Regions:
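Juxta-kinase regulatory segment immediately upstream of eukaryotic protein kinase catalytic domains
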Residues: 1-23, 31
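Protein kinase glycine-rich loop
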Residues: 31-38, 42
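Short beta-strand micro-motifs within the conserved protein kinase catalytic domain, predominantly
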Residues: 106-124
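Conserved short submotifs of the Hanks-type protein kinase catalytic core
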Residues: 122-138
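Catalytic-loop of the protein kinase fold
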Residues: 183-203
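Activation segment/activation loop of eukaryotic-type protein kinase catalytic domains
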Residues: 197-246
Length: 352
């Protein structure tokens, strides 16, 4: 899917003023802002159809399950400051367009436009990315709410956010399956920023939540050969900018001068995320709060402490599962296929 350029100044003004946004030939009305971070803003929008007979964005969407019945979607606006940021956005669009899986948030459409800055009449670029909307928020949002209420996910829900075992479910497989889809590419892709803030949840009455992994801005081919100190430092610098520190694998903090990096960096992040699903905090931020010291040292040494959880507590087998994923040596850390086999056994043992 190629990037679209045009001089739609009205787009920039509309977003800031709560008006209408055009992505290529489709028009959307800003309803409200959902969030922001860095140079990006996320808005809830509703498609505007001038003629009821027009199908609008629906005709561009390949998977009918991604078509909104009420015309609401999410738009991510990215302010692009320089050519480096422009290339990063283009790469995010390219990578996002590779994936097609029910547990990975799909990019429905996009536009990169040139806009005139009012103050000095100069031009800059902005990107607009269209996605399905999930209004129940992220796993991080839910964890914060549950922590205030001193609530916990059940063992069954914890496992089924990771891996849905009911083959009759439209959302079968969940987080692990989304990661498996990425790792199954040739060459494999790593997400590189798996964390609760990048997992969207949709709650369902009487069922486990639907979990969808989003934000592929850091996703890259997973396998890298490091053969010098310079290459190791370059990887560490890249990781410091693209991989959230509390969920970053040890080999991305302190990379050897001779190393083979692979998709198991994501397994580490998955282990941290599973811990966070259980306790509402990442393992090494919790350890840091308990003992102080350095986040990097806590991660490199895999210092895991267990918070007070629900009553009755989570089973020891679940703790062992987390510890298995948080092996500091990547060569002995499991692959996603191993994770799926193991979590299926846990689900059959502990799910209701």
């Amino acid at each position: 899917m190629g990037c679209s350029f045009s001089g739609l100044n009205a787009l920039y003004d509309a977003v800031n003023g709560g008006g209408d946004v055009w992505i290529n030939e489709n028009r959307f009305r800003i309803v409200r802002q959902l969030g922001e971070g860095g140079f990006a803003y996320v808005f809830l929008v509703k498609e505007v159809l001038s003629d009821p007979s027009i199908t609008g964005i629906a005709q561009k969407i390949k998977d009918p399950s991604h078509i909104s019945e009420d015309g609401t979607y999410a738009i991510k606006k990215v302010i692009i400051q320089n050519n480096e940021q422009l290339e990063l956005v283009r790469e995010e669009i390219r990578v996002s367009s590779l994936f097609s899986h029910r547990n990975l948030l799909p990019l429905l459409d996009h536009a990169i436009i040139a806009v005139k800055v009012t103050q000095d009449q100069s031009w800059k670029n902005e990107a607009y990315l269209l996605f399905p909307v999930h209004l129940d928020g992220t796993l991080l949002d839910n964890a914060k709410t549950m922590k205030v209420k001193k609530e916990f996910f059940s063992t069954s829900d914890v496992l089924q956010i990771f891996r849905q075992d009911d083959v009759t479910e439209e959302t079968v497989n969940q987080l692990c399956a989304g990661v498996e889809h990425m790792h199954g590419f040739d060459p494999p892709y790593a997400h590189n920023d798996i964390k609760p803030g990048n997992v969207l949840l949709t709650h369902r009455k009487g069922k486990s939540p639907i979990a969808i992994l989003m934000d592929f801005g850091s996703a890259r081919p997973a396998r890298k050969q490091i053969r010098s100190r310079s290459e190791a430092l370059q990887l560490q610098e890249w990781a410091s900018e693209h991989c959230s520190a509390p969920f970053r694998a040890p080999e991305l903090w302190d990379c050897p001068s001779h190393a083979d990096i692979d998709e198991r960096t994501d397994i580490w992040s998955l282990g941290c995320t599973l811990f966070a699903i259980m306790y509402g905090v990442s393992p090494f931020e919790f350890a840091l709060g308990e003992s102080g010291g350095s986040l990097q040292l806590a991660i490199v040494n895999a210092q895991i402490k267990w918070p007070t959880g629900p009553n009755p507590p989570y089973p020891e087998a679940l703790h062992q599962f987390v510890t298995w994923m948080l092996q500091p040596q990547p060569t002995v850390r499991p692959c996603i296929g191993d994770i799926i086999i193991h979590v299926d056994k846990l689900i059959s043992k502990f799910s209701n």
